[in-house]
Amino acid sequence: MAAAKLEDADALIDSVETFIFDCDGVIWKGDKLIDDGVPETLDLLRSKGKRLVFLTNNSTRSRKQYGSKFRTLGLTVDEEEIFSSSFAAAAYLQSIHFPKDKKVYVIGEEGIINELELAGFQCLGGPSDADKKIELTPGFYMEHDKDVGAVVVGFDRYFNYYKVQYGTLCIRENPGCLFIATSRDTVFQLNGVQEWAGGGSMVGAILGSTKQEPVVVGKPSTFMMDYIAKKFGITTSQICMVGDMLDTDILFGQNGGCKTLLVLSGVTSHEMLQSHNNSIHPDLYTNQISDLLAVKAATV
């Protein structure tokens, strides 16, 4: 069924208790708000008693670091309302009672390290392996830590061959070693005219060398939907997922049984939404989240 354009913001707002917002392409793009109406939109929803949750597949920062970004942009958001895929990796390991005497090898940035250590896990890799190299000489044998019980892979601007090989050895040679991906996002945007390789490209490299599918903890996996619903005591049918990507945000909402609202302020254009090649259709779409302010104008 084709998506309908948002015409009655009031009806949508009244139909749910909670709004889950993606961040990049919805709240901000880079280091700027999507538009000046974002703060007022969030304030309006709060004034109507709606719970707000912010969920990003970007694993480069911790929840605390994202809290700082929200404040820098002039938005009042509690850290308990923020959920990143770096946090999701730690939450997943806690949910399966990952042994604290085992270690986690991280291919990713400090956001993952921070969240894992905050949860009490021992970490290797991450930024400390950014400059490491391997000399591929005949007979070379690479040592790796046999106590690594999980490899967590996220977006990594300092991705290199050393990390690929170390992670591969852990997954292939350490019995029961888990392969966890924060997301499989293919691309992201910085300037609106170019697409940049996302964390899925790093995950793909490890998948290619290990021939093992990862456990994905970010969108569109339902792990964080289940986690958030349990944490706040929410029925998923009372949630509206708001995002700019069809194959992560909207699919995440659909997989979780939520209402879905696509905004055209990020990766997905109207042409992409309407394309006959697109098989993911949100319940509603609109240009940006400040279109929800139409309810305010209508009641003045």
Q: Which residue ranges define each predicted feature?
A:
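Asp-based, Mg2+/Mn2+-dependent phosphohydrolase catalytic module
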Residues: M1-C23, W28-K50, S59-E80, A90-V300
